[in-house]
Amino acid sequence: MGVLNISDQPPLVQAIFNRNADEVKLFLHKKDEVNALDQERRTPLHAAAWLGDVHIMDLLISAGANVNAKDHVWLTPLHRAAASRNERAVGLLLRKGADVTARDKYWQTPLHIAAANRATRCVETLLPHVSSLNMADRTGRAPLHHAAQSGYQEMVKLLLNKGANLSASDKKDRQPIHWAAYLGHLEVVKLLVSQGSDKSCKDKRGYTPLHAAAASGHVDVVKYLLRNGAEIDEPNAFGNTALHVACYTGQEAVANELVNRGANVNQPNHRGYTPLHLAAVSTNGALCLELLVNNGADVNMQSKEGKSPLHMAAIHGRFTRSQILIQNGGEIDCVDRYGNTPLHVAAKYGHELLISTLMTNGADTARQGIHGMFPLHLAVLYGSSDCCRKLLSSGQLYSIVLSMSKEHVLSAGFDINTPDNFGRTCLHAAASGGNIECLNLLLSSGADMNKKDKFGRTPLHYAAANGRYQCVVVLVGAGAEVNERDRSGCTPLHYSAASTAFCRTDRPHASTHQNQEDGEKESFLCVEHLLDNGADPCLCNTKGYSAVHYAAAHGNKQNLELLLEMCFNTLGDKESNGSISPLHLAVESGHWECVTVLIESGVCVDVCDPVGRSVLYLASQRGHSRCVELLLSQSASCLLAEHRSKWGPLHVAAANGHSECLRMLLCSEGGADLVNVTDAEGQTPLMLAVLGGHTDCVHLLLERGACPDMKDRRGRTALHRGAVMGREDCLTALLSHNVSVLSRDFQGRSALHLAASCGHADILSNLLSAADHSQPQDPLTDRHGYTPAHWAAYHGHEDCLEVLLELKPCSIQEGNPFTPLHCALINGHSGSAELLLESSVCNSLVNIRDAKGRTPLHAAAVAEDVAGLQLVLRQGADIDAVDHSGRSALMVAADYGQSGAVALLLHRAKADLSLLDVNKNTALHLACSKAHEMCAMLILKEIHNPILINATNSMLQMPLHIAARNGLATVVQALLNRGATVLAVDEEGHTPALACASNKAVADCLALILSTMKPSSSTASSSSPSSPSLNLLKHCGITAACPPLPNGGLRHGYGKDRHGATIGLDGCLTE
């Protein structure tokens, strides 16, 4: 209970704490509030239960005290009594109806409280009333967990005897033995193990009881677990053994026990760290490190990042440990994966004493590490002047020269001006780091301040970019050129103007607001100092940007003001040279304060960039409403449009859904007159808002007078766009403003056509309802006679077809005779076809013909939609119906090479193979003419009439001629086996053999050669006029190619229908 002054409590509570039952009776007789609450919502009964005064408790309960009252942390009087270990109070409360399952805010029941507080008798009193001994609190711990944590052996024994689950796990999978081991309760651990607890059980992170005991340094528990068979080198989920854990936590006694028991001192974890690595880095791991080294630990073993124990010691400056490692063979110049030695690491983290030790032991100060940097680079970059001084005093290049011969006999160290991989010297690093003492040390040691990196930047560029004012002052004072340009043409002033964008962010202080303000102040001082020392604010880089541009782009208001003061009247010249203006750059990133500064300096607010985008356009596009407001207050024009698409500010605001910017534009002077302004394609802001689905912008434009029926250059309105994109909310807004639902585009399509084509059923339903109110007699056809039903069927949108069948059933039979059923089947949408055939308005369409005489069965044959073919055949389709070119569905399938359709029509429907088209082609002719070998073979297997084998078409060609010409060897063999004649000639006088020739001229030549090879005989001399040689001589002078198989236009009939204007429904609205 909270500590309160008893004298401040009500008289009843004071009487309870004085244990004066008579006074309690008196106050209760005076009707004092028995359930009064203190500031922590505790009742008098809570106080009595905590005291354990059963008589007073009984008086309070008899007077109406609530036995289950909860205080501010949900503790009941029963919780209080259990915590006080008063079994009589617990018993009384239970008899008076106290809830034994009541939970506090941590979900702990009175049993949890009693187990945690060693209240054995209270637990014995509670046990007959609880249904489960293993109920978990908020952390998942059962009463046995709390008992094990308390270390009270009798409580643990009681709960186990009553059936508590020995292996109960909390939310981190920790069992009671984990907690007992971690807290060093050896007797409890022994008891749990004797009862069968798993001494090697693991929690969610793989920690065993041995890990837990090792972490907290309980060597007696460690010894007991090891004696009872605990695996000494068992790793956890991170690969750490108990020895890793002991070394990391500095538990030398445990580490000693583990090593003596044979623990592997060189076992790496998942990151490659051994116990020695962790001992080297640990706060209290010095003794552990010495122990490991003395017991054979590998002092040069490297982690997966290449770090040795000496690297780890260097990170935290463990001076003594580094000496031990070096004395025991630790490699001084061992490099990690980044090329850094321990000296690099010590220099980075500023451990001057450790640097001395490493250098004394021969560390190479000239070894290049990450990005080719010396240790000195890192020392000055991270601002350690002591380390810098130490490295300079011992590491600079020096030579010993013989006095007589002038011969160099010894040289060591490094050249202070040696660049890293990016051309940066130590002076560049010092200028970037900002430590003025390091900078002065380098300059006094001969560092070249005019040295440039690979990007042409001097140390002054780096100091300016990082806002290092003192470094800038020193470098400028030392003679650094303030107008020196780098390879991109930028001077130090450019970088200083935008220094907050280039400052390093890996320092812990860089994120605080105070340091951000300090950085902005230093940046301003850098700009001021550079300007005072001759920096030219009008110099532009290779892209035409000056320091003013940089300050504006990065929102540095103070720098911008200072630079503008120094630019005088040159800013207007910069704006007019065709490059992007500072105002554009400020607006693009939404730096409204910089926009204000630029406007006050007199810049033109209607300046445009090279592609014609005005500043207002850019602000509207990005949605920077403060900038838009500022520009409009200066009368920025809303009429200026960019060059390519002619979009203006209203277009981009609407297209990007920036409703606040759009509202400002519409409310500006003259803005209301631009509500219907069009771009190069004739699009209005309303169309673009609908296209993007920006409902708030749509409502705003409509309220401001936008015309919903305006059309673009292709005749499409905002409604067309909403129908294509499925913008239901936008369409609702348009419909509420009486938009013309049936407005047609240049192809005669309305929004209904497009909604049906794109499958937006809900939108189609709404549009149909609106159209029915406005123009109920409209046939809903486009220029080619197609209705929304055609489009829905063509794309297989069954939900749209259902809407049309329900709301506009008559439209199914209207329009182009190439019906919706044809459209569904030709694209293989059998589900849509079935839906149409099942409807009452379409049940007579199964044999309907289009303008070319084609039935739905023809369409299904083209698509090889087996399901569609079966569907129309079940509905009574005429299998042998022919179109105007004389072709049946089988002939169409053979012509298109749809072998599945051919097989179905032949085997199941028994299609007539003797049918001829207008050019006397059979199905076999058509299959061979397109080289559809599989179809030809299927047809051949079903031909039982030999006449069909040698049937000729209008050009006297047999299937053998055509198959031979197309190189169908399998079909030719089958035809020959079926008795196809090899001497029959076509109208060109060619036999099937000559038909194999690539063209007519080749065939003629082949015939001449064959004729000369024949032996002379009376039979040959008296050959009939129709013999091949005579016919060939008749045409031997003709060299034109043999004409193709006549098809009366049918060959391309369906192709045109699928891709042309008659059948092939072209794509819907594309933007």
From Swiss-Prot:
SMART domains attached here?
ANK
| Renumbered ranges of ANK repeats | 7-36, 40-69, 73-102, 106-135, 139-168, 172-201, 205-234, 238-267, 271-301, 305-334, 338-367, 371-400, 422-451, 455-484, 488-539, 543-573, 578-607, 611-640, 645-674, 681-710, 714-743, 747-776, 784-814, 816-845, 852-881, 885-915, 919-951, 955-984
- InterPro entries per the record? Ankyrin_rpt, Ankyrin_rpt-contain_sf
Please give the subunit comment from the record: Protein phosphatase 6 (PP6) holoenzyme is proposed to be a heterotrimeric complex formed by the catalytic subunit, a SAPS domain-containing subunit (PP6R) and an ankyrin repeat-domain containing regulatory subunit (ARS).
Lineage runs:
Eukaryota, Metazoa, Chordata, Craniata, Vertebrata
List the gene name: ankrd52
- Role of this protein: Putative regulatory subunit of protein phosphatase 6 (PP6) that may be involved in the recognition of phosphoprotein substrates.
Q: What is this protein called?
A: Serine/threonine-protein phosphatase 6 regulatory ankyrin repeat subunit C
Keywords associated with the record: ANK repeat, Repeat
A Pfam family annotated for this chain is Ank_2
